[in-house]
Amino acid sequence: MKPSVSSYSFQQLISSGEITQFEAIALAAEIGFEGIEFTDLRPNNKKDATLEEQLEFARALREEAKRCGIAIVSYTIGADLYKGSDEADAAEVKRVMDQVKVAAELGAPTMRHDVCYKAVIGDRTVGFDRMLPTIAKNARAITEFAATLGVRTCSENHGKIAQDSDRVERLYYAVDHENYGLLVDMGNFACADEDSALAVSRVAPYAIHVHVKDFVKIPFGKEAPEGLKTFSTRAQNLLAGCAIGDGDIPVAQCLAILKAAGYDGYVSIEFEGSKPCLDELRLGISRLKAMIG
């Protein structure tokens, strides 16, 4: 396994305007990461960039990564593959396919897209099982297109709907395409109140990319320490992002499970805490390297 980092880990500095995604590359290399992945590309922190602007930015990022001696290992975007109508679904599939072109321009071997964010469409509760056939059909169309560009696609346990290990496993088999796999985020299972080690043991065989993430867990009814940035799980417990090894996610065990399943690719730290990100990433990579050997 090789240590990598998500550009989202630098979001404190990107949001404040101190750096852009471009400058995150040199920072990641300086800290000691061997790979970096990018979330939705925003040239010069521009949120509404056109596809052509993103493609041009992707080329610049690829050259900068080459200069810094660091690999671009994945590209991550949001997506909703169940919009409630054929027309809306088709438009979203087209948009995601355009983002596959960005991944290819980056030189990223994998691209992660979300699949859904909500189980209520209009005034109707839909539910995951009812959405699954449509989501799988759309994800299959995307991965078939991505295969022509040499990019593997994957979905992550993310978004609180398609987040449990049994759901993402069912999604994997419903898509049923050799170019499609899972991005296994060991921390995100806690967002659905699932034990991370058990969840990872279920989905490890399907992993084509991995996020390493740690959270402090705060049970429902307990107050979070002052100054700690938290968010609610599906069952209304609280989580707070932290450096790898400072929380309650069994990171070392999850990595061991993945290794036993044959995973030997990049493992990307995705830091979501409130402490200064550079300090936490330096601490995190030292611990991660010790865990992966």
Predicted segments with their positions:
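Short, acidic/polar
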Residues: 16-28, 90-101, 192-200, 251-254
